[in-house]
Amino acid sequence: MIKNGELKPGDKLDSVQALAESFQVSRSAVREALSALKAMGLVEMKQGEGTYLKEFELNQISQPLSAALLMKKEDVKQLLEVRKLLEIGVASLAAEKRTEADLERIQDALKEMGSIEADGELGEKADFAFHLALADASQNELLKHLMNHVSSLLLETMRETRKIWLFSKKTSVQRLYEEHERIYNAVAAGNGAQAEAAMLAHLTNVEDVLSGYFEENVQ
């Protein structure tokens, strides 16, 4: 599994129940996330056997899908669920395997987030850089490419929804900074469990805010 740094093409994923328990989400959320990964061509569901990571070239997933697809509320919801399943593992691995150079890159992105509170676009880019730096710190090449793919999709969606108060109000930007700071501190301390918890809290908050936006603004 991703959490242990052992995910590779051909591996069988844990059961829906096991994934739900591991990442503290509902079974329906796991099923939706797996369906999104299947749509991306990253996993294969075999009847009566389970779900397997597909064999593919890393460069096949280097380009994001069309942002237009993601403007539907349900698509964004599924993307965020996929991120939750992936990035909790990323945080744990980063805490275990990060180098000093990795920590410096993560901290640089964090500092940039804290210094440009009034600029939503640059804030999005710094947020993006923070999460990709965490993925780099996992020292898992496949996981880094998976994260780059999913995060690129999210960044495109963010650019299309700049009115979201998450990136337009100083108070919410400060909250985001503090959430990322907690993730960084846990990774720097080498505390995998704390890093997982901080990432889960962050992504749950992002999910709640974006869901609220789509409820109010997108039919």
Swiss-Prot record:
Residues 16-35 bind DNA. Keywords: DNA-binding, Repressor, Transcription, Transcription regulation. Disruption phenotype: Cells lacking this gene show a derepression of lutABC expression. They are also defective in bacilysin production. This is HTH-type transcriptional regulator LutR. The keyword Cell division does not apply. The lineage of its organism: Bacteria, Bacillati, Bacillota, Bacilli, Bacillales. SMART domains: FCD, HTH_GNTR. Negatively regulates the transcription of the lutABC operon, which is required for L-lactate utilization. LutR activity is regulated by lactate, since presence of L-lactate, that probably binds to LutR, leads to derepression of the operon. Also appears to be essential for bacilysin biosynthesis.
